[in-house]
């Protein structure tokens, strides 16, 4: 039954309007063109980096609408419930890319804990996911992976990373939520 949604477009797209389907069709047609995709990514990165005011609305009405359920747990639940009617689970993914500040790692840890609380007892959200780089700098993982002697500040930094893992894993265990 679960795979039937991927084999039968009537099931897969039953909840979509003609307008939503046409929009998705043209978006995917554009994405399959490497030149358009590369130019689009470059333009998006440039406009985001330079704080162009209109970018947020364009992204929300295109990519975000197609690939995301919402900006908050509550907002996303409409999509989660709709998908679960067809036996498709959802995940709440929270990621901060390229940040290296301890406060950001702590905020990410707290956000993952909120995701765990929200997923608890909800079969429509079968697991919670996070990236290791949300808990610490890639460089500290590399140093630990090389098994080199860490400096005092690196040891303290690694201890904070480990503490974030322990907090999140313990909470997930206590609430019977799968982590990935």
Where do the PLM segments sit?
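Conserved catalytic palm subdomain of right-hand nucleotidyl-transferase polymerases, strongest
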Residues: 180
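Alpha/beta catalytic barrel-like cores
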Residues: 2-177
């Amino acid at each position: 039954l679960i795979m039937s949604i991927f084999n039968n477009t009537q099931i897969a797209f039953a909840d979509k309007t003609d307008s939503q389907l046409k929009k998705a069709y043209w978006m995917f047609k554009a994405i399959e063109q490497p030149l358009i995709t590369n130019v689009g990514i470059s333009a998006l990165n440039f406009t985001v980096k330079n704080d162009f005011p209109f970018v947020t609305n364009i992204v929300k009405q295109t990519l975000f609408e197609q690939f995301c359920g919402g900006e908050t747990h509550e907002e996303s639940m409409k999509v989660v419930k709709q998908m679960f009617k067809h036996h498709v689970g959802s995940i709440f993914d929270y990621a901060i890319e390229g940040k290296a500040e301890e406060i950001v790692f702590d905020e990410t840890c707290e956000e993952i804990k909120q995701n765990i609380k929200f997923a608890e007892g909800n079969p429509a959200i079968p697991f919670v996911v996070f990236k290791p780089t949300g808990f610490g700098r890639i460089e500290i993982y590399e140093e630990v992976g090389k098994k080199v002697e860490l400096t005092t500040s690196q040891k303290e930094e690694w201890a904070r990373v480990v503490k974030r893992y322990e907090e999140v894993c313990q909470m997930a265990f206590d609430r019977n939520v799968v982590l990935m």
